[in-house]
């Protein structure tokens, strides 16, 4: 489901973080901490 987000890299690191993003809290799909603007 978050493939499209990981593909664009919308301010995120990539698909590698997409799966551990929930646990790490560094993913945009869950909690956009590193990107508050979403840019």
Curated annotation (Swiss-Prot):
Keywords: Disulfide bond, Hypotensive agent, Secreted, Toxin, Vasoactive, Vasodilator
GO terms under cellular component: extracellular region
Pfam families, per database record: ANP (PF00212)
Prosegment residue ranges: 1-8
Tissue specificity comment: Expressed by the venom gland.
One annotated GO molecular function: toxin activity
InterPro entries xrefs: Natr_peptide, Natr_peptide_CS, Natriuretic_peptide_brain
GO term, biological process aspect, one: vasodilation
Segments for region (Disordered): 20-39
Cystine pairs: 12-28
Compartments it resides in: Secreted
Entry's family note: Belongs to the natriuretic peptide family.
Function as written in the Swiss-Prot or TrEMBL entry: Snake venom natriuretic peptide that targets both NPR1 and NPR2. Exhibits hypotensive and vasodepressor activities.
Protein's recorded name: Natriuretic peptide CnNP-b
Species of origin: Cryptophis nigrescens (Eastern small-eyed snake)
Lineage: Eukaryota, Metazoa, Chordata, Craniata, Vertebrata
């Amino acid at each position: 489901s978050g493939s499209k987000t990981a593909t664009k890299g919308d301010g995120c690191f990539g698909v590698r973080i997409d799966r551990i993003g929930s646990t790490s809290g560094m993913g945009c799909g869950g909690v956009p901490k590193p990107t508050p603007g979403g840019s």
